[in-house]
Amino acid sequence: MRFKKRFSLDWILKIGTILGLVCLGLFGVIFGSYKLLNDSRLGAVFNGSTTTTVYFLNHKSTNNTSLDPQQTKPTNGIENITNIDSFLDGVEKSYANSLFIQGFSSVNITKNTNDKTASELDNIDKSWLVNGGLPSVTLTFEQNREQAKTRQRKRQVDAQVRRNAISSVEHNYQLSLETTDGVVLFDSLDNNFINASIRAVVPQNTSVNSALTFEYKLNKNVVTKESLHTDFLDFINSKNLSSSDYNTGNGQASVEGNGKFFKQNANGTSSSGNKTLVLWKDKQGALNYVRNIFNVVEGSSDYLTFNEREKSLWEFLHAKGSFASGDNLFLNTDANGASPIKKASDITLKNLYYIYAAPNHFSAVASNSNDNNNQNNNNNNNSSDVITVSNSADTRKLRSADSSGFSGLFHNYIISEIRTEDPVSKTGDPVKINPTLQSFLDTNNQRIEYGGNIKFQVGNFLSSDGTYTPPNFVTAATVKELLTNPFPTAATIATAKTSLVNAPLANTITDVSNFASSFIAFGIIVLIAAVLLTLRYKLLGLYKALALGLSVVSSLVIFSAVGGVVDVFSFVGIFFVIAINLINLLNLGELFLRNIRNNASIIESWKLCLKRSFFANLEFHITWLISALVVIYLSNYQVQQLANLMAISAITSYFFSYGISIVLISLFVSSESGANWKLFLYQKDAKALTKTSSNYSLLSSTSDLNTDFFITKNQHDFFLKNNWKFLFVWLILLAIGVVMLVLYLVQPNLLGEFLAADVESSNGIIAGIGIVSLLYLAYCLIRYGVAYCLSYLVSFILLCSGLFAVMYLTNYLFSIDQSTIQLITFVYLFWLFFAAKVSQTTTWTYFYWFKRSLKDKVFIKNLFNDNFNSQWKIDLIESSSLVFIFIIYSGFNFGGIDGNFNLVIFYLIAIVGLFDVATAFLPMFCFGLINGWLSPFNYVHSRLSLKHKKHPFKEIDQIEEQLIAGINSF
């Protein structure tokens, strides 16, 4: 049997390369999607938002004592905070950082310098109010919860989310080294504390263990390696701890006796104190947390949401359950068995540690007692008992030491515990340093780098089961980030209240999480785009679809691999990446068909398509990348994360979406199979292939242009006099744009919750757009001339007017009290969308004419008129696709628990639609009209002439474009 046609080596190589690239592309899409669905760095995706208002005292301490908002305001030792606005700015920045570190990336924060609702609260003393209110910040963020995985009722789920929100925001991260009874040796607000010195140690060699280090400046000129421990003990003794549990009593004498937490001698009869220090990372947060647990009413929705540990803590505080026995280790109950803690304010910073644990007492002189037996002796009644302390866990006995014990809850607030001394052999012997202090003051790790004279190192962190383990680098770095962005010095949280903003989303598909359903929506969007591209452009569309899928999946995979959190911000960003890639791919496809309709062959059409789109695509992607890098540099937290995703997407879009598609198509077109028009064209377009006129080529020379290229006149003339009435509209919008910009700069609060979580990020987006736009203007002036530059400038101002107007309009129309939608990020994303459209118009208009600038006014009008008559349909499709994408996304996140709708999803569709209108039409129409009007003034002379060239007959017929009927029809 013979084949009618032999396959050439060229054909085999090209088709083999194509199949290899296609297989690799499909593998990348499938493997990348699988990896994303199994990724551990998945954030909340519209699981229902909560809004929490945190109230702060208007006063600050003048004598370094802590202020308690549940007690009557003292008459001395306090003063008013003078600059509330600046104070709240610091609080805002700290919250933006801490919530981002905790994994809440959809965060919005608003401020109120005098919140009158504080007067309605019953858990703060009214003497603290100033003019009937208190300063406050209101935080809205998404929480990750799946109701399908629990049997709890809706009210229990809601209560759990509210409590989670409270515990997430009632933090005041501040490093503090204290005695067990709350005497502060130093904290991170101390003038001698070197805040910049807090560092997470990078693991060395094969170890994965990290540590936290920081420096302090003792009141001594030089601290040597030999005097290190002695100097630190002298520093402790200088704090006048003679009456502290550190030096006297049985370790917890301050909370024993009548009217106190524990019975007399509950911790033994020793008299040398406990010699224990506690390193807190958030003691104020711990106090708020324990008080909130105490305030929960038994049997309430909040009570029913307690986990095992929280319920154990509640029972301890109320002397109920397993803590109602009257054991002298526990609470000093009265005759009726009631707890000595009558109200939340009875729990203070001074006695908080003793709820967590009972410190083991210190014996000044060692004895011959059985240390191990004594260590297990809960009562420690014999003052001669010596308890061996070799690590931080030995310094205390947990109040509940089992795996579900409540003491483990304190790992969110305590970093470490340090015993400073060990018993000596006999009275008068030199001080013996305990191993925990030796580790805390590692003599081999005293390289001072930040201006202190003593360096501390914490190599073991308190864990959730009450034990101590070495932290990994991520854990240490997280603590470091939280501690280096604290509240302002004067900040004291008064109280907080929270509520659900919208009904939480239920699983939209059985046993599928919200993230998975969102990812399914993402997959369907890519699939629909692939089908439509294939239907429109046949084989070209199929290759483009593969490149599109590989590009967007790679963007998310790489983003996740470098530490990004894949959440609602990521999905919003990647949907814009899809829409922008569609603009570029549609542009390539329509240029190809335009060449075909102009009687060029398939091969020549594709070559011209690449030639005339390469630089425009390169310019746009460079602009995209630079803008993302600028926003990364100028912004913080989730906005910075979004910019990271966009920077990655700029690279993957160019090399995968644009690069892979043109490689695949070029290889196939240049193969023998590329001559088969049925693989590329429908019969309507293929008819143009039979109209090839001759073997002539138009080459640049010195003859003048004619205007007879336009054989037919378009139905719509954008240069009619009536259309110039739009100039009046443009002038009004330009004025509005200036007003909007001034409003943003002067009164950003008018945008309310739709700004970013912190001021720097909002300003970073605006500055980034402005800087990159100015750079692009300077580039355009050199490359395209004055007409293009002025057209872009006016269009850009119109765009800004529209985008800012939409932000204000949206804030007014939807009247959302709080939302996790940050409209300021949409300004950046739609600016990118606009830039992609400008790139498309540039390719469509300028590059099609081989870089030459034209000066014949009639010709220019006809050229721009023809281009815009053809391009508006493509613009409409591209703009509609963005809204369509968000409709699909919303459909897969539709609904809510008990049938209540989450309207945030539908607000999102409307918001995208409004922004889309502001971006798609008037600015682009203005760009074309002004550019066409001004182009005759670009006096760069370039002429054409015909040059006859003899060629063997081929399908390639290089002729200049003649704008014949139907050439630009979509």
Curated annotation (Swiss-Prot):
The keyword Membrane applies. Signal peptide: none annotated. One of its GO terms (cellular component) is plasma membrane. It is found in: Cell membrane. It is a multi-pass membrane protein. Residues 367-387 have a biased composition (Low complexity). The chain crosses the membrane at residues 11-31, 515-535, 537-557, 558-578, 614-634, 645-665, 726-746, 762-782, 789-809, 816-836, 877-897, 903-923. It comes from the Bacteria. Keywords: Cell membrane, Membrane, Transmembrane, Transmembrane helix. Its main location: membrane. The keyword rRNA processing does not apply. Residues 366-387 are annotated as: Disordered. This is Uncharacterized protein MG277.
